């Protein structure tokens, strides 16, 4: 669905404000963002596992105002790490350091990881790709929205062919098609 692409671009745009922005790869199973940025050698998993005491040594500056905290080595116990006190402490610290934190994680319906993360985010963004979501699925998305389960739920429609006049399918990439935003700016 282009989740990682969309998150990277929104984060880069927000860093131009100027704002202090972090891309946080919490896809502890595939590390899609880390791989896209060629940053898969060290990262947040080592901090969450207790192998590293200072997560700052794993944060890489991409450009002025924009940094990334990659996954690093994929852990065998992603959900357990996300339920840990170290994860809570990490998020509290990052929230104080950054204006916006964009979290890339697996889809909600595949593994428990994303459901754990949604409890601490300020906004949940579903990335959907034009041509992949059957419009008959829209009532389910509307139900999710009205349930209030996701904080400030939003949808980004990606991959729209503006030349096409075809209707009936909207984008929802099954698999890695969700992104999560986390910010503490008063301008939101």
Predicted ranges, named:
Residues 1-188:
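P-loop NTP-binding module
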């Amino acid at each position: 669905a282009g989740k990682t692409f969309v998150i990277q671009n929104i984060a880069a745009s927000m860093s131009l404000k100027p704002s202090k922005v972090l891309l946080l790869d919490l896809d502890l199973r595939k590390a899609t963002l880390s791989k896209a940025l060629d940053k898969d050698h060290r990262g947040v998993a080592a901090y969450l596992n207790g192998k590293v005491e200072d997560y700052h040594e794993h944060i890489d500056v991409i450009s002025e105002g924009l940094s990334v905290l990659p996954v690093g080595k994929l852990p065998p116990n992603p959900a357990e790490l996300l339920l840990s006190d170290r994860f809570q402490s990490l998020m509290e610290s990052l929230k104080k350091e950054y204006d916006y934190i964009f979290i890339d994680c697996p889809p909600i319906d595949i593994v428990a990881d994303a459901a754990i993360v949604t409890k601490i985010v300020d906004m949940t963004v579903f990335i959907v790709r034009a041509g992949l979501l059957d419009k008959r699925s829209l009532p389910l998305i509307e139900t999710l929205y009205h349930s209030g389960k996701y904080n400030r739920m939003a949808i980004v429609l990606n991959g729209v062919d503006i030349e096409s006049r075809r209707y009936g399918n909207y984008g929802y990439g099954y698999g890695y098609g969700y992104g999560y935003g986390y910010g503490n700016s008063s301008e939101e």
